[in-house]
Amino acid sequence: MLESVTHRDANGDTPRYVAPELSYLLDRIVNVCFIGAPGATDRGWTLVDCGLPGSASRIKRAAARMFGERSRPAAIVLTHGHFDHVGAVHTLAHEWDVPVYAHELELPYLTGQSSYPPPDPLVGGGAMSLMSALFPKRPIDLGRHVREIPADGSVPGAPGWRWIPTPGHAPGHISLLRDSDRTIVAGDAFTTTKQESLVAALTQRAEIHGPPMYFTPDWDRARASLIHLAGYAPAAAITGHGPPMRGERLQNGLRNLASHFDVWARPARGRYRDHPAITDGSGVVDLPPLQVSTRTVVLGGLALGAAIAIATSFGRDDDERRRTEEIARLSPSTNDDGASDASEGDGADTRAGDVSLLARTLNESVSEIDAR
């Protein structure tokens, strides 16, 4: 089985190996993928997704390390257009003068026509879920750069790859498959970390989960997409969130998740639990009623505290890092289902423990409010 090879420089800008001619860059909590052989010529490789806002320079440095200083991609392919996958797309499309491809049902959100269905911050039981209420939701407009991905299933600039429709997490979500070795770029059709938990998202603890609950507006389609991907028995996969996964661990995990999707992946309650957002080629058509909870009273405080913790978390020394790990280990946050996040602090290199404590305190306060 192939092992993940990591070569980290001082800035963390060197892509990591997933499979032959497939590497990825971790941009804080989201992955950006590079399809192409190291040293590929100008326009001889493809970028998949564009990370968080402000990540253009890191992506360009990573591309230069992979393919050379002057090498530009043949195309940018978007698995979907959520803010954490298109953060640098404006800058990169302009500076590289490169086309951006997405499924036709994603185009309304990439051409300024429609906002996505709003997130549901009260599902998933983690700080990241609660923070989602403040995530950017407005559409972007890529203008002349964006176009519909070829209907024949081919992936521009990536011979040997094809795209697969995997809607649910987003109306026009796609994943990429290389049949020759059953390698998948999944996007957010499933994840390999518990993305609803800020601690897990920051520490990248490896475990298979469904799509991020807070941003998934159609659970029936999400389940069908996961079952479809599991049917390929992929040998390797890189998702939008979490480390690469391979072999039997990946295959067994996907099979189990597909078999228990409604229990393990679909939230126990929430706005989209039983009633999806209705969308079409023009964007959002109709939304299920908003489920208001007194928990929203503390939402702003949690989001602000977590955001501050993230902003100040990088570049900590080893002593502080060990202190943070210990806090996260000893002070688990409790999710909506009563499950503990204690083990998610393992290997933390951020102030994840502080965020975990904050989430726990606020969740306990919310429970008291809801009980009144």
Model-derived regions: residue spans:
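Intrinsically disordered, highly charged
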Residues: 1-8, 38, 42, 231, ...
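Hydrophobic alpha-helical topogenic segments used for membrane insertion/localization
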Residues: 289-318
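C-terminal/domain-terminus segments
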Residues: 119-126, 130-131, 236-269
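Active-site HxH/HxHxD metal-binding segment of metal-dependent hydrolases
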Residues: 54-57, 64-147
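Conserved beta-strand hairpin/beta-sheet module of binuclear metal-dependent hydrolase folds
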Residues: 8-69, 176-187, 192
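Metallo-beta-lactamase
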Residues: 2-6, 52-54, 106-167, 171-248
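Residue-level marker for buried hydrophobic side chains located in beta-strands
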Residues: 46-48, 77, 100, 183-185, ...
